[in-house]
Amino acid sequence: MAALHALTVDYLKTRKQFGVPIGSCQVLQHKSVDMFVALEQARSMAAYATMMAGEPDPRERRKAISAAKVQVGRSARFVGETAVQLHGGIGMTMEYKAGHYFKRLTAIQYEFGSTDHHLVRYAELTTAPSDQRT
């Protein structure tokens, strides 16, 4: 995600339309910031899941992993889709890195269970009575 965000920011700075970089458009700057926020949310949740790896309660570990997987999946999808939009047609060509990054982020979203699977798993772990939470 970080590489795709950096590639997108660089593209916004160098691609010119009507003689000015498209990155000078405030709307595109906001989209870039939204991508950065999603990236940082994913990093934070991954760090949280890593910290919870030492938690003695297996239910709490599973909750942390599922929560991280949901956030990483959502962030990956958002960053990938936004990058493709900001790059325009070149964003999905085989010759350009952005398309490859987007495909990889899509694959990551479905590794070890989909985002939806982990959202349901998290909800079940959170709402199940304590004697059923194993």
Give the label of every model feature segment:
Residues 1-134:
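Alpha-helical interface subdomain recognition
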